[in-house]
Amino acid sequence: MKPFPRAEISSSALQNNLAVLRQQARASQVMAVVKANGYGHGLLNVANCLVNADGFGLARLEEALELRAGGVKARLLLLEGFFRSTDLPLLVAHDIDTVVHHESQIEMLEQVKLTKPVTVWLKVDSGMHRLGVTPEQFATVYARLMACPNIAKPIHLMTHFACADEPDNHYTDVQMAAFNELTAGLPGFRTLANSAGALYWPKSQGDWIRPGIALYGVSPVAGDCGTNHGLIPAMNLVSRLIAVRDHKANQPVGYGCYWTAKQDTRLGVVAIGYGDGYPRNAPEGTPVWVNGRRVPIVGRVSMDMLTVDLGQDATDKVGDDVLLWGQDLPVEEVAERIGTIAYELVTKLTPRVAVCLA
């Protein structure tokens, strides 16, 4: 018997999405971003499905070590860099690249003793103002890195966009211009484009693109849908009806008696709640997919359950599957209704949700 709730992960969808992104950026290599447990899709699940990716981007050293332990041989890059000097021998031992974005990291690289140099991607703050060396610092920092024997040469170069998910916002052009002017003539790879860059800003694609959310079939742009770009949702979040009840007009349901039926109807109780990562703040009317149609959530989402209005003439029965988001109900639509972003929904599923390749 299949577990529920479960996140069914489609290997064919992941492979399709990688192919679509390659088509968008034919001259670029693809660093598939699989941080946050593969955006909730399962770190090794995703990496094993995307064996044709040229590399993988991660946020934590532990994620990179898990991939190496799982047999992944491709280039790995720590997008936030290393945090401690004791991380550096592990980078060497497991052939893991690191971003450098701060003075403290440079000092650790200059002081540590290593058996071979580390491959470094220097992050430039071209305008996001979160991580990276400023244009004023760049020449000095670059010279220090070039002089450091613990750093492999050439040094690679990167930046990150603040507003690429706003296709009409020309701040991305400003960032591209700043980065390109600063790094002109220097050797090494360049990477600028995240998912939005790859899809909407072709001039940003460079030597490597770093797609994240788009690999999972989701658009990075508000009001857009991944399917508009040929992407296929890789996750179907599925549970089931555990009760179907006749419900009288003017009767409430759930904690706080928040919702009251306007007419006689049939309610379905679905075995998923905020204890599984489904948002408690999902408002009345948020859709789920039952037997080929959208039906609305009614009442408050509780820890283990939520309630839906199946309609007066519903023939749904206990045991029927319920899709919370996926190929028949885009996660972008659900996120917009709830007032959040799809990234948050797919990455916040709790361990109670079984994640399995479909």
From Swiss-Prot:
Catalytic activity: L-alanine = D-alanine
Protein name: Alanine racemase
Sequence similarity: Belongs to the alanine racemase family.
HAMAP family: Ala_racemase
Pathway stated in the Swiss-Prot or TrEMBL entry: Amino-acid biosynthesis; D-alanine biosynthesis; D-alanine from L-alanine: step 1/1
Organism name: Shewanella sp. (strain W3-18-1)
A biological process from GO: D-alanine biosynthetic process
Gene Ontology CC entries for this record: cytosol
GO MF, any single term: alanine racemase activity
Keywords, sorted A to Z: Isomerase, Pyridoxal phosphate
Gene name, Swiss-Prot/TrEMBL: alr
Residues holding substrate: R130, M303
Coiled coil segments of this chain: none
Function: Catalyzes the interconversion of L-alanine and D-alanine. May also act on other amino acids.
Residues found modified as N6-(pyridoxal phosphate)lysine: K35
Active site positions, chain numbering: K35, Y255
Keyword check for Transport: no
InterPro entries, per the entry: Ala_racemase (IPR000821), Ala_racemase/Decarboxylase_C (IPR009006), Ala_racemase_C (IPR011079), Ala_racemase_N (IPR001608), Ala_racemase_pyridoxalP-BS (IPR020622), PLP-binding_barrel (IPR029066)
Domain of life from the UniProt record: Bacteria
Cofactors: pyridoxal 5'-phosphate
Regions crossing the membrane: none
E.C. number(s) listed in UniProt: 5.1.1.1
